[in-house]
Amino acid sequence: MGMTSRRARERERLIQRLHEEGIRDPAVLKVIQETPRHIFVDEALSSRAYEDTALPIGFRQTISQPYIVARMTEALLAGGSLQKVLEVGTGSGYQTAILAGLAGLVYTVERIKPLLTQAQARFKHLGISNIRAKCADGLWGWPAYGPYQGILVAAAPREIPQTLLKQLAVGGRMVIPVGASSGTQSLMIVTRTADDFEMKTLERVSFVPLVGE
């Protein structure tokens, strides 16, 4: 069996597992199946790229478990169409690429320059042109291009940053893990109404902490 066909089968098995775990949005499953996760991990770990597990990417960061990527993306899409999305924590760029397949424009912020440089090279290699990226403190978001219909935060702050809430459009939603860096956190959906924010807890998760400068 060739490498290409082997990876295609691995992706199919991953999609089947995600479906069994409750991911139902066909658009989310399609873009995950079409996105080569092995491109976003170290070559030494590429044989594990389609396992449903988080993997290290250096700098004490990880590429998230595919189920969590799918769960967060599905939760974000449930709020409606996404013309502009803000991602806090580019990391390997895998979640960014998934969002780019489903949104008009993705603005992503990463504080670790080498990770961002690697991610941008991957976007170029894959021909993804609807991502705008910068190296900065993710706690501040990217207000110049807000408000956003969706905000996805890929690391866990102790509490929801007011700076990010301000960048959420009315009717938009934020998907964010919240809690102390040790142990598990709560994955939350925050929806902005005309005069308030509605919050809902999805499930328990474990993310690296969101660190400010």
Swiss-Prot record:
Q: Where is the active site?
A: S64
Instruction: Name where it mostly resides.
Output: cytoplasm
Q: Highest taxon of the source? A: Bacteria
The UniProt keyword set, sorted, is:
Cytoplasm, Methyltransferase, S-adenosyl-L-methionine, Transferase
- Give the CC-aspect GO terms: cytoplasm
Might you give the EC number(s) for this enzyme? Answer: 2.1.1.77
Swiss-Prot/TrEMBL GO biological process terms: methylation; protein modification process; protein repair
Which principal EC class is assigned to this enzyme?
transferase
Under Gene Ontology molecular function, one entry of this record is: protein-L-isoaspartate (D-aspartate) O-methyltransferase activity
Write out the annotated subcellular location. Cytoplasm
Q: Which reaction does it catalyse?
A: [protein]-L-isoaspartate + S-adenosyl-L-methionine = [protein]-L-isoaspartate alpha-methyl ester + S-adenosyl-L-homocysteine
Family according to the record: Belongs to the methyltransferase superfamily. L-isoaspartyl/D-aspartyl protein methyltransferase family.
PANTHER family recorded? PROTEIN-L-ISOASPARTATE O-METHYLTRANSFERASE (PTHR11579), PROTEIN-L-ISOASPARTATE(D-ASPARTATE) O-METHYLTRANSFERASE (PTHR11579:SF0)
Instruction: Provide the function of this protein.
Output: Catalyzes the methyl esterification of L-isoaspartyl residues in peptides and proteins that result from spontaneous decomposition of normal L-aspartyl and L-asparaginyl residues. It plays a role in the repair and/or degradation of damaged proteins.
**Name of the featured protein:** Protein-L-isoaspartate O-methyltransferase 1
